[in-house]
Amino acid sequence: MKRLITLCLLGACFLSAPAQNYVSQVWVADQGNGTYKNPVLYADYSDPDVCRVGDDYYLTSSSFNCLPGLQILHSKDLVNWTIIGAAVRYALPPVTDVRPEHGNRVWAPSIRHHNGEFYIFWGDPDQGVFMVKAKDPKGPWS
């Protein structure tokens, strides 16, 4: 019996050895030479919308029923993006039923900049059209 346990342990050690050498790769679109490869954003940013303010670009996309919602991303070159905040911290309108509503809530947003303020508009198929605004794209949004 001891011999069987020893063999099993040795086998487990040999099987796990290759996994210790594996290092996962992070997707990088920027090739470092002025070019890029698609996809620029290796994630699910459905219905993206971008606005330019000076030399800066701001992106938001559908977040559906996920919170915090309407992630705000920033870029200087449309290739390298960083998440800088979220425009929706709680369900709009407030809900008492917390079951997931896939395909509902926040989708197809539009981000704009006008007179020193950022605006995001989006439609909810059941509730209507909503808007949040902020002076700084990092927030706070109201």
Protein language model annotation of sequence segments:
Residues 19-142:
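Carbohydrate-active catalytic/glycan-binding domains of CAZyme proteins
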Residues 10-18:
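Hydrophobic h-region of N-terminal signal peptides that target proteins for export
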Residues 2-7:
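Sec-dependent signal peptide recognition
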